[in-house]
Regions:
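Beta/alpha (TIM)-barrel catalytic core signal, keyed to glycine-rich beta->alpha loops juxtaposed to Asp/Glu
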Residues: 1-136
Length: 136
């Protein structure tokens, strides 16, 4: 989930004491660093059929990941941790639910709680372009 899309929804949830649970906050793997091209996806991977993973959209979206990486490196975090920390910065009622297939991903995802993003980092992330291609 892109925190910019939460907008008033996150604030309204907090006002009402309702949790907001962003689904697929790591962009279905974009932010994990597991692939850098369409060909890296297994032949039977459902993402091969999703618009955001088609060749042109994939290139544009991986460029966005590169910009997230530029925020992550100076704070000693991974792009996935920065994405989760960005969501956590939206407030205590925002609880991202990332996929966690391996112990390594569990450790990486949990590490997001220790990532401190500055106001400048948050502004840089907020200025990123929206992902290319429809979500589904």
């Amino acid at each position: 989930m892109d925190p910019r899309r939460a907008g008033r929804g996150a604030a309204l949830c907090e006002e009402q004491g309702i949790a907001l649970l962003p689904f697929a906050p790591l962009g279905r793997g974009f932010l994990t660093g597991r692939f850098s091209s369409f060909d890296d996806l297994p032949q039977d991977d459902f993402r091969r059929r999703l618009p955001r993973f088609q060749q042109d959209a994939l290139r544009a979206n991986l460029a966005i990941v590169g910009r997230v990486r530029q925020v992550a490196e100076p704070v000693g975090a991974t792009p996935a941790q920065v994405a989760l920390a960005w969501l956590l910065a939206e407030g205590r009622y925002v609880v991202p639910i990332p996929g966690t297939k391996t112990p390594k991903y569990l450790t990486d995802n949990a590490g997001a709680a220790d990532v401190e993003l500055s106001a400048a980092d948050l502004a840089e992330l907020d200025a990123l372009p929206a992902p290319e291609g429809a979500r589904y």
